[in-house]
Amino acid sequence: MKVLVVGNGGREHAIAWKVAQSPLVKELYVAKGNAGIWEIAKRVDISPTDVEKLAEFAKNEGVDFTIVGPEAPLVEGIVDEFEKRGLKIFGPNKEAAKLEGSKAFAKTFMKKYGIPTARYEVFTDFEKAKEYVEKVGAPIVVKADGLAAGKGAVVCETVEKAIETLDRFLNKKIFGKSSERVVIEEFLEGEEASYIVMINGDRYVPLPTSQDHKRLLDEDKGPNTGGMGAYSPTPVINEEVEKRIREEIVERVIKGLKEEGIYYRGFLYAGLMITKEGPKVLEFNVRLGDPEAQPILMRVKNDFLETLLNFYEGKDVHIKEDERYALDVVLASRGYPEKPETGKIIHGLDYLKSMEDVVVFHAGTKKEGNFTVTSGGRVLNVCAYGKTLKEAKERAYEAIRYVCFEGMHYRKDIGDKAFKYLSE
């Protein structure tokens, strides 16, 4: 069958890598992809957000199944465009994608259906927002309402920083329409984790658990990013916590969507804070996480394409997990997340291909002649398997020694938060 993967990042490389392993695939396309994906899939030169053009391409080429990686095309209504033409596509429609497309919508939804989350207020007026922040104090979290590539949530340790962030969002509109409205919410203490499920109507199937590292620098310092690394599974989500996540969050979301008359088919990612009171939702995303998808898909033992197709058709599926840990370290460009430098030649990629239990997923890369060069903020995901998390971590960081590009930056502490829970 012909399969199309939509997106350009590390998550999409992981999806394409996993799908390419299926004997069901006759032809694999990617729009637009990156230097890594182009080694295993045909490049389609259409932007992921040009949803009508993509739907036309899929119709004309006879694409049998499409998997959407990033949030922007989903919020733009790619699923609606494909379904209008009778095409099979895995992802939520435009209405359902509001769970990620609007923080205010998501918070209102959570409040209405009793889904545990931080207390919050929504503002469009700078003066009113400033007044509120001065009244409640810091630490506090300021979030742009719309999509901001993972950079729209700012943890403000001081009132001054909160006001400065509000000014950048509401007055300077650094994210355009996405920051015309802000959500201000209480700062939650605890341990972050990611819980991702596949939903089709009222059925859902959990994927392996994971933990992301959102801040740019070690020890969770520096600005928020799209994610600097992840590992799976995470001991932060034990059996008892998982039971609560399923009952208090996932099942209430499904019930709420049903009551709102919204049909949801696709991935749902709950970004969680595991607090003393239990799991609370920081955000919903309507797609796989990036970088979480990379270690998660490395640990899925199923023929992933077959599993998705069966689930899409409403059949029962079960995810078989690899016993090993998988850990992903993101290599980023100098200047990320504000103004990443690009066009730097990447050295050492061929050597990494020969390393056992190491997988490299490309993100911001492209081809220039015979060279692979950087083309974005997050450049590569160097991932490794290990019988223990410690082994996976050592193997990934060992592999990083062989790859370099000018201005390369990465965190040295991916996975460290787990060690206090593990007796390795």
Curated annotation (Swiss-Prot):
Transmembrane segments: none annotated. GO terms for molecular function: ATP binding; metal ion binding; phosphoribosylamine-glycine ligase activity. Pathway: Purine metabolism; IMP biosynthesis via de novo pathway; N(1)-(5-phospho-D-ribosyl)glycinamide from 5-phospho-alpha-D-ribose 1-diphosphate: step 2/2. It comes from the Bacteria. Binds 1 Mg(2+) or Mn(2+) ion per subunit. PROSITE patterns: ATP_GRASP, GARS. InterPro entries: ATP-grasp, ATP_grasp_subdomain_1, PreATP-grasp_dom_sf, PRibGlycinamid_synth_ATP-grasp, PRibGlycinamide_synth, PRibGlycinamide_synth_C-dom, PRibGlycinamide_synth_C_sf, PRibGlycinamide_synth_CS. Keywords: ATP-binding, Ligase, Magnesium, Manganese, Metal-binding, Nucleotide-binding, Purine biosynthesis. Belongs to the GARS family. This is Phosphoribosylamine--glycine ligase. The gene is purD.
